[in-house]
Amino acid sequence: NHGGRATETARATIEALPEVVAEVGGRIPVFLDGGVRRGTDVFKALALGARAVGIGRPFLWGLGAFGQPGVERVLEILQGELKLTMGNCGTQTVADITRAYVATPDWKV
């Protein structure tokens, strides 16, 4: 979808993630890229089966505003938000994050 600029009516990556994870059936790791802005987004992606997430815009915002220290601060914020979310859900490690922690509507188009 490339930031919603080219096809703003396409499904969000997080909406397509469960379908992709089911389709590959564990044969390859699935990475989610697109729409990740907060630590809660990272948590949701991991809970829905992503092995990793790509984060672009928040780092670019930090870089544009404050240079390298801005990028480092964005990373600190995302880590803090993820840790807070994990704590609120009772998960101690990333491996503890499962689908049970998110409710998804019927995202079928």
State the predicted function of each range.
Residues 15-32, 37-109:
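Alpha/beta catalytic cores of nucleotide-metabolism and tRNA/nucleoside-modifying enzymes
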Residues 1-11, 60-63:
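Glycine-rich, proline-tolerant flexible connector loops at the mouths of alpha/beta enzymes
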